[in-house]
């Protein structure tokens, strides 16, 4: 029973972490995010051409399923900075246009497993993944000099194949010639793995870095 349950949870974690790897999500309930703290540099005009530098994220999620009458919950925490980053982004007055954006992730996920609210296992699980280069166009509206709301994927299409929805709040700041897009987003969605239904609740604190040409 212990081995079978652990294998089920590991398969759930792998699938759901793939969904987490994006800053934007297809979810049943997305709070829209609050963004970061922003900066003091002038972000009133961000139009231009950029290279994708990387994306850093802290993710937390809780997946709960009912396995043969036992409530099983996996709580995962991960931190990563993307590698092998490729692609460009063009920002217009109301669009984010990405071309051939891609990256890889190589990190460790901490997983705490609970059975009927009793800690069953605490493990560090290696996770690697690659998002092949892809192109997309997202729209945005300006909220203030350092804040926008984006609808659609921010740069990279969701590797799970699900169409992102949004909207997501984004705070803007500069670090030299690099534009920082900061997102704090909470989400809830129904999930299924191997025919077992469940609920996933999570949050992402991420920063997308774009270097201006």
Q: Which residue ranges define each predicted feature?
A:
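Acidic, glycine-anchored loop motifs typical of Ca2+
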Residues: 65-76
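A generic short-segment signal for beta-strand/edge and adjacent turn/coil regions
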Residues: 17, 57-59, 67-68
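Generic intrinsically disordered, low-complexity segments enriched for polar/acidic and small residues
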Residues: 12-13, 22, 47, 100, ...
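Contiguous, well-ordered beta-strand patches that form the walls/edges
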Residues: 55-62, 79-184, 189-194, 204-213
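Bacterial Sec-dependent N-terminal signal peptides
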Residues: 2-7, 13-53, 210-213
């Amino acid at each position: 029973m212990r081995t079978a349950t652990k294998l089920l949870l590991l398969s759930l974690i792998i699938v759901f972490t793939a969904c987490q790897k994006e800053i934007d999500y297809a979810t049943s309930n997305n709070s829209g995010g609050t963004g970061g703290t922003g900066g003091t540099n002038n972000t009133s005009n961000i139009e231009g051409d950029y290279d994708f530098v990387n994306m850093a994220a802290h993710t937390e999620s809780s997946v709960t399923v009912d396995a043969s009458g036992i409530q099983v919950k996996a709580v995962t925490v991960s931190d990563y900075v993307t590698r092998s980053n490729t692609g460009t982004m063009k920002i217009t007055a109301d669009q984010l246009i990405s071309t051939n954006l891609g990256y890889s992730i190589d990190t460790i996920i901490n997983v705490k497993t609970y059975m009927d609210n009793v800690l069953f296992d605490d493990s560090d699980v290696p996770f690697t993944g690659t998002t092949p280069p892809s192109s997309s166009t997202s729209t945005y509206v300006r909220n203030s000099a350092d804040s926008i709301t984006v609808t659609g994927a921010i740069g990279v299409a969701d590797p799970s194949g699900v169409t992102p929805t949004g909207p997501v709040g984004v705070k803007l700041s500069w670090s030299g010639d690099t534009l920082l897009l900061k997102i704090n987003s909470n989400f809830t969605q129904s999930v299924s793995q191997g025919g077992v239904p469940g609920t996933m609740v999570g949050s992402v604190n991420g920063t997308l870095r774009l270097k201006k040409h």
